[in-house]
């Protein structure tokens, strides 16, 4: 099993009602290019994190074509909301619409025991695949622009920011509860006191800090809950692409906006 991620697909039906090449020729046929790479890279057992801005639709029924397109591709899909996902509805309505084809996460977290595939170099110099068992914990929410960002207006944005901090912590707490339950079950099943290694992944749509990469409530939570990897999108300009560091504290950062990733699924683990 491998772990992949991508964000900001910005789909709008077929033919697209909002072609993305209005933002530049690099967006030409972007969905076809993403699909081709996805199909050549991902297997059904792999996990795919989709970090928001999936469809320009305004209502859930209008987004179904795009969601079914995504669902038809390989992999186990987990999706959070982006700032342009106006179609996002209640958990029950989305579950009824898509069944188990896509799991929608918003302020929630989970964990599972997986066999993670890693590549090692053999003594012969050839690359070989090995698998090791571990706990993968993940969850998240949309996030929001952070204080002291140029676009942050305290009168209107502070309450939304505070709410998203609460949702993020709720997801991280659910992840921890799931980890504890899996560790306990593993110990009882295997009759061992040894614990499985854990990788914690936080999913956000917005970056976890402002345009100056300053600490925020999100980065505080990343440190407090020992988040190993934070995956996010939202950004679409070269200045932002260049300013994102590879790590924040001990957390690895993964920007996966579709255009930043050259319209390819990004391998996380």
Which residues are covered by each model-predicted region?
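Structural motif
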Residues: 3, 47, 136-137, 199-201, ...
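Conserved catalytic scaffold of divalent metal-dependent phosphoesterases
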Residues: 9-12, 37, 41, 88-214, ...
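Residues at the C-termini of beta-strands that transition into short coil/loop
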Residues: 7, 81, 108, 142, ...
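Short N-terminal binding/cap micro-motifs at the start of the first secondary-structure element
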Residues: 12-17, 262-263
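Active-site glycine-centered loops adjacent to acidic/histidine catalytic or metal-binding residues
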Residues: 8, 52-53, 82-83, 205, ...
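Core catalytic region of metal-dependent phosphoesterases/phosphodiesterases
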Residues: 2, 16-119, 214-226, 251, ...
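Short, hydrophobic/glycine-enriched beta-strand segments
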Residues: 2-8
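Conserved beta-sheet core of the metallophosphoesterase superfamily
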Residues: 78, 100, 132-133, 208-269
């Amino acid at each position: 099993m491998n772990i992949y991620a991508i964000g900001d697909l910005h789909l709008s039906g077929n033919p697209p009602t909002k072609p993305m090449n209005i933002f530049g020729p690099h967006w030409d046929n972007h969905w076809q290019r993403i699909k081709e790479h996805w199909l050549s890279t991902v297997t059904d057992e792999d996990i795919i994190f989709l970090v928001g801005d999936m469809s320009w639709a305004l209502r859930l029924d209008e987004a179904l074509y795009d969601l079914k397109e995504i669902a038809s591709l390989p992999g186990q899909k987990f999706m959070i909301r982006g700032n342009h996902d106006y179609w996002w509805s209640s958990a029950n309505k989305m579950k009824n619409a898509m069944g188990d084809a896509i799991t929608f996460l918003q302020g929630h977290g989970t964990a599972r025991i997986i066999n993670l595939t890693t590549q090692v170099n053999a003594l012969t110099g050839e690359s070989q695949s090995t698998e090791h068992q571990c706990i993968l914990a993940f969850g998240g929410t949309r996030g929001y622009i952070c204080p002291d960002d140029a676009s942050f207006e305290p009168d209107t944005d502070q309450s939304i920011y505070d709410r998203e901090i609460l949702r993020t912590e709720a997801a991280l707490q659910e992840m921890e509860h799931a980890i504890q339950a899996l560790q306990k079950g593993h110990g009882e099943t295997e009759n061992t006191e040894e614990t499985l290694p854990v990788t914690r992944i936080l999913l956000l749509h917005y970056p976890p800090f402002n345009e100056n990469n300053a600490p925020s409530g999100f980065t505080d939570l990343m440190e407090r809950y020992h988040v190993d990897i934070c995956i996010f999108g939202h950004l679409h300009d070269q200045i932002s692409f260049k300013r994102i560091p590879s790590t924040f504290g001990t957390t690895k950062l993964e920007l996966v906006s579709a255009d930043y990733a050259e319209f390819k699924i990004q391998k996380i683990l």
